[in-house]
């Protein structure tokens, strides 16, 4: 097995591990969901863990399964582009970008749950890396991602997405997540460029 295949394999296993944790949280039902979700009023009251935990609980099993399938697909598509420590950094920057966007640009958003914003960030970071390495398919992925974001900002959630997830879709999460992930990808690209021999 070559290095790239090993990295893809490891990324898929990491995605499954994340999904196992997310599924365990879902087993807790509504009480766990309400305790962990991004909740503006509760965060204002000092429950700052919600800034992180809210991205790992879901509206229900259909929402979780939809995001789980997305996570596995993204792990397969871009998992080999970064080491696991870099993916952790990408996740932190993506979540930070989303939380800053929610807090300062979406004050009307009282609560939020779900992985979808983080998924957009992971895909964006991997896509930046793919484009940097001149992999043509990532230009296509970038165009698709940009088109999806533009559609959502102009017209709202994609048709059928709210029905399949079991609730309202916060399209701002996709935008902020993408921006956070793209920033992380660019930072890694700049770091590699500065470290390259002249």
Regions inferred by a protein language model and the residue ranges of each:
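C-terminal transmembrane module of polytopic alpha-helical membrane proteins
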Residues: 1-10, 152-198
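Helix-boundary and loop/linker segments of multi-pass membrane transporters
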Residues: 4, 8, 40-46, 133
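Hydrophobic core of alpha-helical transmembrane segments in multi-pass integral membrane proteins
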Residues: 13-26, 142-146, 182-186
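N-terminal TM1-TM2 helical hairpin plus the immediately adjacent luminal interfacial "cap"
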Residues: 15-90, 96-99, 104-113, 164-171
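Central hydrophobic cores of alpha-helical transmembrane segments
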Residues: 18-19, 91-95, 137-148
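Transmembrane alpha-helical segments of multi-pass membrane transport proteins and ion-pumping complexes
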Residues: 23-27, 99, 103, 122-125, ...
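Membrane-interfacial alpha-helical segments at the cytosolic side of multi-pass membrane proteins
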Residues: 65-82, 122-132, 179-192
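A contiguous pocket-lining binding segment that forms or flanks enzyme active sites
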Residues: 108-140
């Amino acid at each position: 097995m070559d290095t790239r295949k090993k990295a893809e394999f490891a990324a898929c296993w990491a995605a499954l591990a994340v999904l196992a944790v997310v599924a365990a949280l879902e087993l807790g039902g509504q009480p766990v969901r309400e305790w962990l979700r991004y909740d503006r009023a509760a965060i204002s009251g000092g429950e700052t863990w919600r800034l992180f935990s809210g991205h790992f609980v879901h509206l229900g099993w259909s929402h979780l399964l939809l995001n789980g399938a997305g996570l596995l697909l993204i792990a397969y598509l871009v998992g080999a582009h970064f080491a696991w420590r870099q993916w952790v950094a990408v996740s932190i920057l993506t979540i930070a970008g989303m939380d800053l966007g929610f807090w300062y640009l979406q004050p009307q958003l009282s609560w939020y749950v779900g992985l979808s914003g983080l998924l957009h960030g992971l895909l964006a970071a991997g896509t930046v890396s793919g484009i940097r390495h001149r992999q043509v398919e990532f230009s296509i992925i970038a165009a698709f991602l940009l088109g999806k974001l533009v559609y959502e900002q102009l017209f709202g959630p994609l048709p059928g997405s709210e029905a399949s997830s079991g609730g309202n879709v916060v399209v701002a999460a996709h935008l902020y997540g993408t921006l956070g992930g793209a920033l992380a990808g660019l930072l890694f690209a700049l770091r590699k460029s500065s470290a390259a021999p002249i």
